[in-house]
């Protein structure tokens, strides 16, 4: 089931949980970056409009989390 999160700190807390298995980063054409975090019960989504904040958030994800980048189709 999907859940949308608006707070970056809350997203990072969920990413550090034991049931967080993978994260997908999707960059849209309108400069939005979506972070999708797969946990056992929910798929959490965070939308970041600022590219610099998105890069900092990507670097602060836990290293044991599998991160996949999904870009625009060519």
From Swiss-Prot:
GO biological process, alphabetically ordered: cytoplasmic translation; protein-RNA complex assembly
Keyword match Translocase: no
GO CC, any one term: preribosome
A Pfam family annotated for this UniProt entry: Ribosomal_L38e
Subcellular location: Cytoplasm
Record carries keyword Cytoplasm: yes
Main localization category: cytoplasm
InterPro entries named among the record's database cross-references: Ribosomal_eL38, Ribosomal_eL38_sf
Domain of life of the organism encoding this protein: Eukaryota
Keywords: Cytoplasm, Ribonucleoprotein, Ribosomal protein
Gene Ontology molecular function: structural constituent of ribosome
Residue pairs linked by disulfide bridges in the UniProt entry: none
UniProt family annotation: Belongs to the eukaryotic ribosomal protein eL38 family.
Subunit relationships: Component of the large ribosomal subunit (LSU). Mature yeast ribosomes consist of a small (40S) and a large (60S) subunit. The 40S small subunit contains 1 molecule of ribosomal RNA (18S rRNA) and at least 33 different proteins. The large 60S subunit contains 3 rRNA molecules (25S, 5.8S and 5S rRNA) and at least 46 different proteins.
Known function: Component of the ribosome, a large ribonucleoprotein complex responsible for the synthesis of proteins in the cell. The small ribosomal subunit (SSU) binds messenger RNAs (mRNAs) and translates the encoded message by selecting cognate aminoacyl-transfer RNA (tRNA) molecules. The large subunit (LSU) contains the ribosomal catalytic site termed the peptidyl transferase center (PTC), which catalyzes the formation of peptide bonds, thereby polymerizing the amino acids delivered by tRNAs into a polypeptide chain.
Protein known as: Large ribosomal subunit protein eL38A
Lineage, uppermost ranks: Eukaryota, Fungi, Dikarya, Ascomycota, Taphrinomycotina
Gene: rpl3801
């Amino acid at each position: 089931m999907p859940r949308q999160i608006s707070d970056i700190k809350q997203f990072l807390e969920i990413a550090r949980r034991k049931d967080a298995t993978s994260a997908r980063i999707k960059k849209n054409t309108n400069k939005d970056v979506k972070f999708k975090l797969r946990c056992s019960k929910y798929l959490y989504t965070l939308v970041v409009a600022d590219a610099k904040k998105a890069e900092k958030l990507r670097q602060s994800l836990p290293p044991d989390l599998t991160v996949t980048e999904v870009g625009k189709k060519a």
